[in-house]
Amino acid sequence: MTTSATGKALNRKQRRALNRSNRLRKEFQPVIVEPLASGQAVSLKTRTGYCVTQFVSNNPEVKAKEVVSVSVKLPDHLAVEANRALKVGRISILLGLLPTVAGTVKVCLTEKQDSPAESFKRALAVADSSKEVASAFYVDGFKDVSLGDLEKDLSIYLYSEAALAANSIRIRMEVEHVMPKFITRFSPFA
C-alpha cells in the first residue's frame, strides 16, 4: 500500500482517483514555432481549444520571373461540412527548397487575384528565400476566417527568378484553427 506525503495510507479508490487525475493533465498542445523573420524567434503554444494542421503542397512548373497560383486544399478529415466552419487563428508558411533551386523564390498567401502579379503588392507577409528564414507569419491577417473560406477564397502565390521544374519546392503551411469535431461513436444503424 502506498502512502501520500502526509504519511497516511491511501485506499484503492484514492490511488485510482490520483492516477486518473494525473492522466487527465497530460495534454500536449501542438506548437507553432514563430519564425525568426518575425523578430522574436520564440516557440508559441497554441491557444486552448485550438490545434495546428499542416498543409503541404509541391510547386507546379514555373517559368522565369513569373507568378503562379497554388490552391489550398483541405485534408480529408477537415473537408467534412461541420469542420469547414471552424475558425482560423494564426498561419505560417515555410519554404523547403531543393539544392538545385537557384535565384530568389517568394511565396505569399492572399485572396485570389485576377492578375497573379498583383498578389505580392497586397500580401501581408512574404516568405523570401533570400532572407535568413524563408517563412511568412500571419498573426491577425486571417483570424476568424473559416476553413471553408480559406480553401475557397485564398490562394498561395509563388514567384521565382529562375525557371523551376515541378516538385522542386515544398510549401508547408501551418494553420492554427479551432479543434475539429470528430465523430466519436460508430453505429452501423445510424
Curated annotation (Swiss-Prot):
Primary location group: virion
Gene Ontology molecular functions: RNA binding; structural molecule activity
Residues spanning the membrane: none
Keyword Electron transport appears in the UniProt entry: no
Region Disordered, annotated ranges: 1-20
Annotated compartments: Virion
Keyword Ribonucleoprotein found: yes
Entry keywords, A to Z: Capsid protein, Ribonucleoprotein, RNA-binding, T=3 icosahedral capsid protein, Viral nucleoprotein, Virion
GO cellular component, one term: ribonucleoprotein complex
Role played: Capsid protein. Probably binds RNA and plays a role in packaging.
More details: The virus has a tripartite genome (RNA1, RNA2 and RNA3) and an encapsidated subgenomic RNA (RNA4) from which the coat protein is expressed. Virions are icosahedral, not enveloped, with 32 capsomers per nucleocapsid.
Family of this protein: Belongs to the bromovirus capsid protein family.
The protein, known as: Capsid protein
Organism name: Broad bean mottle virus
